[in-house]
Design a protein with these regions (language model features):
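Glycine-rich anion-binding loops of enzyme active sites
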Residues: 1-61, 231-233
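Acidic, glycine-rich loop-and-beta core segments that form the ion-binding/anion-interacting portion
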Residues: 41-104
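Short, surface-exposed linear patches
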Residues: 25-27, 45-48, 69-72, 165-168, ...
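N-terminal hydrophobic or amphipathic segments with adjacent small-residue motifs
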Residues: 7, 22, 31, 38, ...
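Glycine-/charge-enriched secondary-structure boundary and capping motifs
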Residues: 15-20, 84-103, 109-262
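Phosphate-handling active-site elements
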Residues: 34-37, 73-75, 166-169, 215
Length: 262
């Protein structure tokens, strides 16, 4: 059989004209009644974010351009005023100096184990609450959004159904210092940064309000910071930026409001 879809890696400025990239993709199988996605998301759901470990694997074309234009060495120290430090579990935690290069090489945090545990416990919670009769709300966890290329809003709106919107408050989490340093170093405005980097949020779960405490406890046990960052609503979205229709998905809208805490 043919497995449609996969991953196309883009490496501008890295691969030469005669170089090539080998990429792999895995396709999973799930029982239809347990499939998560926008079909489960409804007004009143809460948006919970899980902290990233840094840049993850996106936005490096902009990073390289900033560093090149600023003529900064990868081995240079980041000013202490930015508060940049190796995150929990970092392979560079014992480094004498957490340099710009090490901060940019920080491995991408994996959320697969946490997400699978939440899906299982959300399913069990729905059964215990008597919500297991074929309704869409057969799981307290309704959708996940992995924040990759394009930033938070562009990835989150892919799991918001048409007619609904997620209002995200930028002030609900602390943006890691590496992003502010790169923004200052390259003169990058908030909108450009928001559309390129994860700005501290690597994964998002959309859950039933009753399941928020269990979601945040699971993240804590996994050693990850989590925060309630927004709510799914109907009606007219509020917020100075409204993003929809990204990455070929015609769904709902993400409205970004407030100011980031740097």
């Amino acid at each position: 059989c043919a497995l449609v879809a996969g991953e196309t890696a883009e490496h501008p400025g890295v691969l030469g004209t005669e170089d090539f990239d080998v990429a792999g993709a895995a396709t999973g199988i799930v029982d239809a009644p347990r499939l998560l996605g926008p079909q489960r998301v409804c007004a009143g759901d809460l948006v919970v974010g899980f902290a990233s470990s840094g840049l993850h694997s996106n936005g490096y074309s902009l990073v390289r351009r900033i560093v090149t234009d600023a003529r900064v060495d990868w081995d240079s120290s980041i000013p202490q005023s930015y508060g940049v430090a190796a995150p929990s579990g970092s392979p560079f935690a014992e480094a004498a100096d957490y340099t710009l290069g090490l901060a940019c090489l920080e491995p991408t945090r994996l959320y697969s184990k946490l997400c699978l545990e939440l899906e299982d416990s959300g399913w069990l919670a729905a059964r215990q609450a008597g919500d297991f009769a074929g309704e869409l709300d057969g799981n307290r966890v309704h959708a996940f959004a992995h924040v990759t290329g394009g930033g938070l809003a562009a990835n989150l709106c892919r799991v918001i159904p048409a007619g609904l919107h997620a209002v995200v408050d930028r002030a609900t989490w602390q943006v890691p210092g590496i992003f502010r340093y790169l923004m200052d170093l390259g003169g990058v405005d908030v909108t450009s940064a928001e559309d390129t980097w994860n700005l501290g949020v690597g994964m998002v779960a959309i859950v039933h309000p009753d399941f928020v405490p269990a979601t945040m406890m699971a993240a804590q046990v996994a050693g990850m910071e989590s925060f309630v960052m927004g709510r799914v609503s109907d009606g007219v979205p509020a917020g100075e930026r409204q993003i929809s229709g990204t990455k070929g998905v015609a769904g709902g809208t993400v409205a970004m409001l407030g100011e980031y805490r740097f």
